Amino acid sequence: EVRPKYEIEVLSVHEAMPGHHLQIALAMELDLPNFRKYGGITAFVEGWGLYSEGLGYDLGLYKDPYSRFGQLTYDMWRAIRLVVDTGMHYFDWSRQDAINYFLDNSAKTKQDVMNEVDRYINWPGQALAYKIGQLKILELREKAESELGNNFDIKDFHHEVLKRGALPLDILEKYINDIC
């Protein structure tokens, strides 16, 4: 598989720092029961990965137009998943309908789009977790910023999100509400 160069920076942020590498390294140090250590909460795990892509701006990354384009196309790709997966599994879209929508609304290659659509056919709902998780983390961050005002600290917020390992989003929301 070949990826365009404009995806390199955002992919690195998602998979490495501050994305999954950071998230999983911290989780592996926690004293959690095995079912929590080795089971996954996709909306949390991939939601953090997608949320972290946006942190690239805060970290001074995406300095050139191509890197910014890469981040924006990745975010759009995850939003398209919401439409395409729902279209196929609720509105009875055909595989070709899904491919056409994806091609019309993304920067992905035809081969990438076909692979993605086949993934959604074989694993209904899974790909939705990325965007749903990201949106929940962003919602919780906005709430914490609003409630805490000048006392809001982004590092403390991220610590609060990650310090218990992967959680169902409603449980994460409870913990964030407790600090607000």
Model-flagged regions — what are they?
Residues E1-C180:
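N-terminal maturation segment of proteins
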